[in-house]
Amino acid sequence: MIQFLDQVDRLLSNPPRSRGEARASQARLGAAFKVLAEETLGFTAAQLDLLPSQAFSDVSEEFVRRARAFDPGLSGEDIYQAGRNAWTANGLQWLLGLPVQNTPSVFAYSLLYPYTDNYLDDPAIPVATKAAFNERFRQRLAGEGLAPADAQEQVIFDLVAMIEEQYSRTDYPAVFESLLEIHQAQARSLKLIRRAAAPGEVDVLGLSFEKGGTSVLADGYLVSGSLTEAQRSYTYGHGIFAQLLDDLEDIGQDSREGRLTIYTQAAGHGSLDSLANRTFLFGRNILSGLDCFDVAEPVRELIRRGADLLLIDTIGRTDQDYSAAFLRELEDHSPFRFSFLKEQRNDFLRRHGSLVKLMETTLLFQASRDVRDPY
């Protein structure tokens, strides 16, 4: 861990000044992470060698350049948010045996997130305003011809047009049905932006599942055009699990900003031990469906192990919501003491700020006009 963090610290303290330096830095960082993964996280060299690491690195770099070219006003955090969805789509491409690449649909759908998701999640914007925007967006997704109301809508409609250029509405109706499903889920999820609700007043679990599931289901259709029933079931479940992880990590922020999740509802009424255990079991059940993809069992095991570690780390970072006994038991399954991870994380934040800066340093600089070195 220390070796890996040292490489991260060097990268952030001395940002690369050319593409050649960046690639060398990325190679050193990758080598340090491989040592960390093998010696501490419990992965084998054979498992890691099965991952298309270089392809993911290249496609991430390209995504950032294209996003900057599409809208120079996008912030690093916006691109990071969009990139997270693109990485999910790229992962599905790999699982489906497709080339790992930024297709027009993957690029467009991923960029829709900073333009729409943040807008709809903003508690300062009146619900009526969001509803009006949502209806116009729905009409455009449904293929209705209408002129954009403002510059923001123009950008959003242009992104929808990118998807239409790749997929014919006639030949690939499921693609656009999936987009309407995630749009409907986003609209319905506005009911979650409230500080409290009487029992049964808001279907928090159902709305959360729908929002997460439809998001990754759309990724699946956008990367392949069609899915088997088993693949559809897995991608929907994957999206739910990812949503639960996000909600578990954001308990404090969601509580402060008045967003209902199954975790904020339970927080303050006792420990979340039981709810966290159910989240573990749910994730393992979903990931058992990985056999719908033609990938080697060591890869499936790597994904399952990675999901467990991610959930353990998330709980360790929000330890105030759990009992001491539960945390001690969970820590036995962590490669690091929670106190050590917290110390390292706090030190990183003091020195460098958020993890978004790491992405900006390793990727965003390559889109800068100041970088002249083609090598």
Language-model segments: what does each one mean?
Residues K211-T214, G239, L302-L311, Y322-D332, ...:
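Alpha-helical transmembrane segments of multi-pass membrane proteins
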Residues Q3, Q7, A24, R28, ...:
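Exposed alpha-helical structural elements
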Residues F43, R317-T318:
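Amphipathic alpha-helical coiled-coil segments
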Residues M1-A55, G91-A142, G220-Y234, H238, ...:
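Acidic, metal/ion-handling microdomains and their immediate structural contexts
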Residues L112, D150-I163, E201-F209, R256-A267, ...:
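Short, surface-exposed, charge-dense and proline/glycine-enriched linear segments
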Residues L50, S57-S105, Y109-L112, N118-Y119, ...:
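All-alpha helical catalytic cores of prenyl diphosphate-utilizing isoprenoid enzymes
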Residues G145-A174, L272-R317:
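Primarily interfacial, aromatic-capped hydrophobic alpha-helices that serve as membrane anchors
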Residues L41, P52, F63, A276-T279:
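Hydrophobic face of amphipathic alpha-helices
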